[in-house]
């Protein structure tokens, strides 16, 4: 009887289960459940269903002229910039949005409120500092020649964003305006594992990024993309041309995204000859040796500071590093078209030897050559790996990787970060919203 009861109970359960599964009144919609929210339009005049730009594709442009100065006594970076913003969209713009990512490191920022003091990659790692941008001037420049006018901007700051209300609508389809901003900030030692400072035997290494106000992206999907930066989530930026002047102490070597325009002013004659050797070599060539770090003759004579001038075209971002402690080496990168680029590594004496950073240029060269064959030819004149306080982060043509890494770990992080030059740096995806697109790839 007991067995019969168990049998009948099992039959009843199976019957009820079957009815539940065939219930036509279910509100579940599998199409809605699995529909993507990152590409809702399968095809239009701007974006085709194949992923290629449509016949009326547009994107706005932001060109930057930047002058910055590094004060190694205070760790303050001060500067000014002129942004030339071109509105290629079909929409007139009454206001502009900019990103102030350094504001994430203010004590009263949203990031400081929501990021754990310890145990998180984001934030300042518990460091308390008077961080964030100090904006001393924002001006609008319109017109050219005799019609040029300069006026103080009407702007508001909302956390890590700045809104500029325009006195006159910026016209669609090519309207242009210039924005001049004077700024400064105190660099954190640990800036969300994306920038920072590390102290070494022979001086501090400054790994500097998100160091100037940058335009938010205005696109056809979301209009202004103004999601705040709280330390987590990376970046979405307009493309443009960058010209930057970086003034640092004369015993420093400064490496930056792009092409160095004044090598004769920044390197010695011996070092210039070594650069020429590196450009013709598939093996690593020392530019500044470990023995030369504290040798005054390894730096140009006669000045307390040197201004390094760099230029990079058609990029969404730049980053730079500065230190008196750098050993520097380089080698040629061979590209599929027959052109070449330059692999460069800069690291302190603590990172030299025992299968460590003396192999970084070898790893950088191998990574860029591989991805150039596999995906798309590397478009930049240099690929620079900086030994840093940062565990691993990518910027166009520059990576910051831990100065403690060595062996397979150094190879892995170097290869990963330089792979990011294709995704998202060349592709230009929205990392703030869809970080999985480049990290997951």
Describe every region a protein language model picked out.
Residues 97-147, 247-252:
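Solvent-exposed beta-hairpin/edge-strand motifs
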Residues 213-224, 230-415, 439:
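Hydrophobic helix-coil surface modules that form long, contiguous segments used
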Residues 108-126, 184-242, 263-264:
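Glycine/proline-rich low-complexity spacer/linker segments in large multi-domain proteins
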Residues 421-434:
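Catalytic Zn2+-binding segment of zinc metalloproteases
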Residues 21-78:
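N-terminal, polar/Ser/Thr-rich
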Residues 81-83, 87, 100-102, 175-189, ...:
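Short, hydrophobic/aromatic-enriched beta-strand segments in well-ordered soluble domains
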Residues 23-28, 67, 76, 86, ...:
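A surface-exposed beta-strand-loop module
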Residues 1-24:
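Bacterial Sec-dependent N-terminal signal peptides
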């Amino acid at each position: 009887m007991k067995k019969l009861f168990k049998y009948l109970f099992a039959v009843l359960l199976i019957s009820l289960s079957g009815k539940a599964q065939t219930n036509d009144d279910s509100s579940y919609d599998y199409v809605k459940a699995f529909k993507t929210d990152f590409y809702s339009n399968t095809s239009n005049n701007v974006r085709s269903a194949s992923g290629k730009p449509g016949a009326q594709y547009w994107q706005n442009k932001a060109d930057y002229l930047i002058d910055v100065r590094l004060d190694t006594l205070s760790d303050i970076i001060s500067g000014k910039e002129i942004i030339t913003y071109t509105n290629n969209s079909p929409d007139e713009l009454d206001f502009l949005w900019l990103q102030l990512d350094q504001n994430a490191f203010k004590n009263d920022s949203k990031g400081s409120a929501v990021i754990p003091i310890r145990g998180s990659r984001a934030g300042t790692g518990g460091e308390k500092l008077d961080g964030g941008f100090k904006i001393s001037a924002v001006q609008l420049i319109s017109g050219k020649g005799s019609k040029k006018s300069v006026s103080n901007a009407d702007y508001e700051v909302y956390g890590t964003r700045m809104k500029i209300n325009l006195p006159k609508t910026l016209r669609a389809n090519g309207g242009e305006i210039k924005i001049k901003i004077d700024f400064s900030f105190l660099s954190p030692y640990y800036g969300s594992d994306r920038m920072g400072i590390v102290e070494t035997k022979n001086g501090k290494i400054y790994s500097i990024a998100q160091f100037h106000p940058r335009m938010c992206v205005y696109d056809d999907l979301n209009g202004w993309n103004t999601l705040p930066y709280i330390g987590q989530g990376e970046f979405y930026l307009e493309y443009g041309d960058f010209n930057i002047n970086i003034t640092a102490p004369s015993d420093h070597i400064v490496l930056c995204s792009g092409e160095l325009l004044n090598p004769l002013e920044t390197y010695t004659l011996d070092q210039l000859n070594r650069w020429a050797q590196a450009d013709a070599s598939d093996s690593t060539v020392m530019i500044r040796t470990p023995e030369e770090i504290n040798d005054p003759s390894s730096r140009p004579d006669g000045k307390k500071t040197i201004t390094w001038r760099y230029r990079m075209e058609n990029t969404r971002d730049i980053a730079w590093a500065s230190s008196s402690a750098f050993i520097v080496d380089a080698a040629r990168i061979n590209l599929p078209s027959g052109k070449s680029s330059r692999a460069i590594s800069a690291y302190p004496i603590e990172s030299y030897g025992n299968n460590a950073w003396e192999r970084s240029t070898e790893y950088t060269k191998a990574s860029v050559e591989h991805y150039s064959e596999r995906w798309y030819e590397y478009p930049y004149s240099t690929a620079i790996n900086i030994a840093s306080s940062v565990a691993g982060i990518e910027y166009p043509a520059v990576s910051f990787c831990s100065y403690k890494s060595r062996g397979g770990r150094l190879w892995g992080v170097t290869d990963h970060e330089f792979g990011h030059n294709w995704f998202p740096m060349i592709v230009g995806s929205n990392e703030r919203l869809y970080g999985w697109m480049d990290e997951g790839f």
